[in-house]
Curated annotation (Swiss-Prot):
Cu cation binds at residues 235, 270, 274, 278. One of its GO terms (molecular function) is cytochrome-c oxidase activity. It is found in: Cell membrane. One of its GO terms (cellular component) is plasma membrane. Belongs to the cytochrome c oxidase subunit 2 family. This is Probable cytochrome c oxidase subunit 2. Binds a copper A center. It comes from the Bacteria. Keywords: Cell membrane, Copper, Electron transport, Heme, Iron, Membrane, Metal-binding, Respiratory chain, Translocase, Transmembrane, Transmembrane helix, Transport. Its EC number is 7.1.1.9. It is an enzyme of class 7 (translocase). Subunits I and II form the functional core of the enzyme complex. Electrons originating in cytochrome c are transferred via heme a and Cu(A) to the binuclear center formed by heme a3 and Cu(B).
Length: 315
């Protein structure tokens, strides 16, 4: 690192390499010229490695945005879990990753060993046998054990997600082409449409293709049940950070639940191909304090469909 600092700050350092004719200069691979001084200098391997390290650090600093708490371009991992179900799914995913990695390494190593150990050069006369009882038992029993180990926590999470606990709030969700309609039956059937905000109406704090004109608002630390259906074709109500993806099927009501402890806005999208503007059906759930939620309910005007569809951004 000291060499790198000297390289960028002291021309004398470059002169040193220019004048040095000792055998150690044979190690230097890179030659360049300083336009400000006219000096030609060679760059030592350590300095080259240092410049690569700086570039790598800069890349990591920029790419760490991919691990932020909201969906971003080029994101390579999950959003941080915001609900009990998603926390369990996150841990289960990591658990499966260890098992999958071990299996891949074992199979790849075994394949490489067999290719080298039993090729035609090393074994000009191949062995002749049709089966091996011990090996067949092993490759049957071990996968069964692995599947059982995977199944136990998987069924536990599935049961936790399917069993609706005592809820503090119920919200009805109806999917239409191409917007969402929400109803709060616990609050005098308060209802409203939720349509994606167009590009020309976006504000600095809005997320393009994700923010809507009317968000779902729920209180923090409240158990919320969603009753989900559709009014035309099949849609899917999905919010990754909350760990649910529930199909909205016409003529059928599906349900799920969530509980969010952290205030903020959590985004999702329709995750079932539902027509030409399927990609313009975002979901935005805003989590606020209980006091703010009560104030929002009090100030929110009731809306009615009146047999009319809202004006869609995508139209």
């Amino acid at each position: 690192m000291k060499n790198i600092i000297r390289h960028f700050s002291k021309p004398a350092y470059r002169e040193e390499f220019k004048e040095d004719t000792s055998p150690r200069t044979a190690e230097y691979k890179s030659v360049s010229e300083d336009s400000s001084t006219g000096l030609t200098y060679t760059l030592p391997p350590k300095a080259k490695f240092g410049k690569m390290s700086i570039a790598l650090i800069c890349f990591l600093i920029v790419s760490c945005n991919c691990f932020a708490s909201e969906p971003l371009p080029w994101q390579v991992t999950f959003q941080p879990p915001a609900s009990p179900i998603m926390e369990e799914l996150h841990h289960f995913h990591n658990f499966l990753l260890y098992i999958s990695t071990a299996i891949v390494l074992f199979v790849a190593g075994l394949l490489g060993f067999v290719c080298i150990r039993f090729n035609a050069k090393n074994n000009p006369v191949p062995a002749k046998f049709s089966h091996n009882v011990l090996i067949e038992i092993i490759w049957t029993v071990i996968p069964i054990i692995i599947l059982v180990i995977i199944a136990v926590p998987s069924f536990k999470i599935l049961r936790h997600a399917e069993k609706i606990p005592k809820t503090d709030l119920t919200i009805k969700v109806v999917g239409y082409q191409w917007y969402w309609h929400y109803i709060y039956p616990d609050h005098d059937n308060l209802e409203f449409d939720s349509v994606m905000i167009s590009d020309e109406n976006l504000k600095p704090n809005h997320k393009r293709l994700l923010d809507v004109d009317n968000r779902i608002v729920i209180p923090e630390n409240a158990t919320v049940r969603f009753l989900i259906t559709a009014g035309d074709v099949i849609h899917s109500f999905a919010v990754p950070s909350l760990g649910f993806k529930i199909d909205a099927v016409p003529g059928r009501i599906n349900e799920t639940w969530t509980r969010v402890a952290k205030k903020g806005v959590y985004y999702g999208q329709c995750s079932e191909l539902c027509g030409i503007h399927h990609g313009f059906m975002p979901i935005a759930i805003e989590v606020v304090s209980k006091e703010d939620f009560d104030n929002w309910i009090a100030s929110k005007n009731k809306t009615a469909m009146n047999g009319k569809k809202p004006k869609l951004v995508a139209n």
